[in-house]
Curated annotation (Swiss-Prot):
Coiled coil spans: none
Classification via PANTHER family: DUAL OXIDASE 2, DUAL OXIDASE MATURATION FACTOR 1
Family: Belongs to the DUOXA family.
TM annotation in the entry: 22-42, 50-70, 92-112, 176-198, 200-220, 248-268
Gene (UniProt): duoxa1
Database matches in InterPro entries: Dual_oxidase_maturation_fac
Cellular component terms per the entry's GO annotation: endoplasmic reticulum membrane; membrane
Source species: Xenopus laevis
Protein name per Swiss-Prot or TrEMBL: Dual oxidase maturation factor 1
Extracellular side: 1-21, 71-91, 199, 269-308
Length: 308
């Protein structure tokens, strides 16, 4: 390739902004929450606010479980370095290089400092999925054919199967099990919501506990990859280091919240069953029915006394 002649995209490049799947999940949860808020005035009794809190908490847990399966910030890292812009070229570029790892693959970002350099806007975000080894290798070969900037190709090469780093095997296995266990957590989330809607509270509590355990086990599976030897991704004297991202910590907080709630509900079931019935709107209806029956019996007794 001749100097200063770079391949370019056949169409204008649009950098990655938001994942449409995440937006769809957020919209569905917001619409569902608004629906429950609208019907809230039609609910009788003092347990109205408790019912709304229970619904919103359950929606939050379900939304997190579903969303983190598609996010790309379980592990992340950025570095600012001066590096070669294109392969087989002497043009240097000062840019911020980012690595974003999720359960479905990774994203590599490249943003120039400033953005406009070398007569073009440097703002890349390339996705490399690893749902299968062939898919990742195909994405990597496509990146080479398209002539992507050297930093993106260099980082992606570290995750290929043929690389000596072994990052693909480490991350692919850990994310495979993490994603699978997280989907089991989502299934158990659906089950405990169904069980809570029926008078089988104890089984619902058990399934909520299973949901929490599955989330925590999924996090442990993902974190286990950091115990393996790390292959350095180096740009000059700087090393691109990663750390746990927003999705990891959000999943951890949600899993602990789900665990605490299940243990509290189990404690109430053993010690204060009436309080638990009030939370799930069971006790109030029973008390009202008993009260109406007592009033009918009392009125019938009074009528008999008047006749006598």
């Amino acid at each position: 390739m001749q100097a200063n002649i770079f391949p370019f995209y056949p169409q204008p490049r649009t950098p990655f902004k938001f994942d449409t799947k995440i937006i769809e999940i957020i919209i569905i949860c917001i619409v569902t929450a608004c629906t429950f808020i609208i019907i809230l005035p039609g609910i009788r009794g003092k347990s109205r606010s408790i019912w709304l809190l229970r619904i919103l908490t359950s929606l939050f847990i379900g939304a997190v479980i579903l969303a983190v399966n598609f996010t790309s910030d379980w592990e992340m890292g950025t570095i600012t370095a001066t590096t070669v812009y294109k392969s087989f070229s002497h043009s240097m570029l000062n840019a911020s290089i980012g690595l974003w790892i999720g359960l479905k693959g990774l994203n590599i970002t490249l943003i120039g400092n400033p953005e406009y350099q070398l007569n073009e806007t440097i703002n890349y975000n390339e996705e490399f999925a690893w749902e299968s080894a062939n898919q990742f290798e195909t994405s990597y070969k496509d990146a080479l054919e398209r002539g992507l900037p050297f930093p993106i190709v260099y980082v992606a090469e570290k995750f290929t199967i043929s690389s000596d780093c072994g990052l693909f095997q480490q991350y692919c296995i850990s994310t495979y099990y993490s994603s699978g266990i997280m989907w089991i957590a989502f299934c158990s989330w659906i089950l405990y919501n169904v069980l809570f809607s029926m008078p089988v509270i104890l089984y619902g509590i058990y399934m909520m506990f299973v949901t929490a355990i599955c989330m925590l086990v999924s996090l442990i599976s993902f974190a286990s990859v950091r115990k393996a030897p790390v292959c350095n991704i180096q740009f000059g004297n700087s090393i691109l280091k990663t750390h746990f991202g927003v999705s990891y910590w959000l999943s951890l907080i949600t899993g602990l919240l789900c665990l605490i709630i299940s243990l509290v509900l189990l404690f109430l079931y053993k010690t204060q069953p009436k309080v638990l019935q009030l939370i799930f709107s069971y006790g109030e209806e029973e008390d009202l029915s008993n009260k109406s029956e007592n009033e009918e019996e009392h009125s019938s007794v009074l009528s008999l006394n008047e006749i006598l």
